[in-house]
Each structure stands twice: as structure tokens, then as C-alpha cells.
Amino acid sequence: MNLSEHLRERNCPVCGSTARSTILHPANFNEAHLDEFAFASRKLPELMHLDLVRCPICTVVYASPAFTPEFLCSAYGGAAYDSNEEAYFAARTYASGIPLTPNRSDALEVGTGNGAFLIELKKAGFKNVCGVEPSSAASNTAQPQIREFIRPGMFRAGDFAPASVDLLACFQTMEHLEDPRELCASTLQLLKPGGAIYLITHDYDSWVTRLLGRKSPIFDVEHLQLFSKSSLRYLLESCGFERVEIRTIRNRYPLSYWFRLAPLPRAAKRLLNRVLAGTRIGRIPLSLNIGNLAVTGYKSSLR
């Protein structure tokens, strides 16, 4: 596959600015090194990315040219999946920050994976839950009692009625969207008055990124934009959300997963993971601040 055939120039995906700054990080991806996990979640970091520029208006770092929506639909639909255990760890972490809304009736998750967070939503009292997931490999690993709540395919706002959702959650997915602003604007229409959007994203300005530079796992060929607190606030407030709150979180995963993210040679990580997989040490959970942000915003209760 020639990936260059599926790339197109774009304006800033957050503010729409046509202003062009110089390339911040030149593309360094080698198509020959991409495999079936290239568009999978929680994979071994490849440390490859597209041309990245910073918007001089809203400060988001974004890829241009970037993959077309048609290519992304195909790529994510056929992506492999091998992070079932980590998904449950992440879901429990994110469940602790579920926003308070007037009602806990209807919740929607975009990019639900194996549906782990849908289970947490049920525990939190939401009566009706729905997850949208393009990867059949991911959704096929869902627990039987939750699989019926997962819709296959890419998220399309038109599939849901306006003002029908109390909470829309979207975790580690905003970076992958060709048009993240469209998702936020659509969410505002789908939410009931007083409803909330709940996002988890990487933080381009985090201490981890400053320390590791382009060896940080957030530099990835599937990440079409990298947010910071300022660009996230700009995005949500300009889309009409109120009471926007952004905070740094601590992720909790088994020790073996943290080593998968470490800036070590891939061969060394594979060997280390095999060793840890055969011991109890690898299963020890550890909470770390690796530069992820939890973001919440509310639709006006008067709308």
C-alpha cells in the first residue's frame, strides 16, 4: 500500500486556521515498518509520525498532510487488537472521573474498544449505554453481556437523536480523528441540557514529552493531532461547552505494560515482556503520571 495516496493537506483541525507555520517535526515514518497493529490501541510504540506543524492561533500540533477519512475507516476497521487486559485497567481509572450530570440515563462512548468502560458506566448507574467501535478485532473480545451494546463502524452523529445523551465519552481517540472539531460540535447537539463530554487525551506539553522528545510514544503515525491544555480549552469553549475543566491524571497499568512504552529498542522490549509475562512481577499494577489529560465540558442547562 502506498500511504502517500491517502494523504491530503488540511487546515488546523481545531480552529480552522489556514495560517501555515514551519514544520515542527518532519515526517519520519517508513511504510515497510507498519504492520497490522499500526492503527491499533496500546501497541508497541513505533515512534513514527507524519509531518507535524503547530497552529499559531490555537497552538494545537497537527499533521498536514493527514490521512483521509476513507482511509482511516478502512485502517481502523481492519486493525489488530491485543490490549484486552490494559483496557480494563484504563476503564477503572477513567471511571473515577465520570462527570456529574443531571441524569444518569443514557451514555455513549466513541471508540469503545472491547467495551470495558461500558461496564463501568453501568456500575455508575447509567441505564442505557452504547459504544461505537470500528475495529471488529477489538469489539469481538467484549464480554458477552456487554457486546450487544457495541455498534460496529465509525461514529456518525446522525445515527443518534439530538438531545438524547447525558454523557459522551471519548478516550485516547481525539488524536486519531481527521476532524476532532466536528466530533465536539456534534456532541453538543447530541447532549441533553446539562449533559457532559468526557475526554482523555495525551498532553503535548507534558513533562514526559519534554523529557523524551520524539521518543515519546505520543509521536505516532496514527496521531493526526496532539493537544495541550490550551488547545483543548480553545476547542471545547469555541464549540459552545461551558465549565470546561482539564486536569492531569495518573494511569494505572501492570508493570509489563509500562515497559512496552519505555524508550527501549523493540527487540529488547519484546524480550523483557516475555520475561515479565512469565512472572508475577509483570502483573504488579503501578500508577504513574505519564502526561495524559482528563477533560470535561458541559452543555448549558438552558438549551
What are these regions (language model features)?
Residues M1-F171, P180-C184, T248-I249, G282, ...:
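Conserved N-terminal segment of class I S-adenosyl-L-methionine
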Residues M1-H6, R214-S216, Y253-S300:
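Membrane-proximal basic amphipathic "stem/tether" segments
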Residues H25-A32, S74, V244-K269:
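Conserved catalytic loop of SAM-dependent methyltransferase domains
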Residues P26-E36, L199-Q225, S230-L236, F259:
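Short, glycine-/aromatic-enriched active-site segment of Class I SAM-dependent methyltransferases
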Residues V129, I197-L199:
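Hydrophobic/aromatic residues located in beta-strands of well-ordered beta-sheets
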Residues F171-E178, E222:
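Short catalytic micro-motifs in class I SAM-dependent methyltransferases
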Residues R181-A196:
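A short glycine-rich, Lys/Arg-flanked "PGG" loop and its adjoining helix->strand segment in the class I
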